[in-house]
Amino acid sequence: SSVANLEGRVMRYPRMDKEVLATYSKGVIASSGCPSGIIQTRLRLGQFDEALRAAGEFQDIFGKDNFFIELMDHGLPIETQVTGDLLTIAKKLNAPLLATNDSHYVHAEDAGAQDAMLCINSGSRLDDPDRFKFDGTGYYIKTAEEMRELFKDHPDACDNTLVIAERCNVMFDDHEDGAFMPKFPCP
């Protein structure tokens, strides 16, 4: 992500191409991504073959055991529209499923505070009908039970979150200042 932030910004968003991904792919576990990612975007545009090809390329880059087809459900039409195709891609590539949740706040009752923060960030008001806001619901850290209920038709997608957790073995050295971020020179 450092390369994406330092060298790959497109507008204000960090991005990296597949060559950079391949360079740093060793030991990385990846998923197909959210609705704004290339795979789901291609599916929404009716370009199934291109979505399948992109998923296959990611699987080649990260390895068959390290690339997961990601399922999300916030009640958004753009998510439900592509779920069937994502399942088909997973089957065609023999890729495991992964249940994820886009989390922007800790508890469900924090949604109002998040909404207010979005208004502060964009300089708009809560009563502005045209302001930026999240569509759908459930952008908080869900419990295992909530996720299993949401993805009850695909329990393996929830199981795979545990498979990934068990595979992650990261140790951080103690730092004097408590920070684990790289130090970048200030201009």
Could you describe each region identified by the protein language model?
Residues 1-187:
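Phosphodiester-processing cores and adjacent nucleic acid-binding clamps
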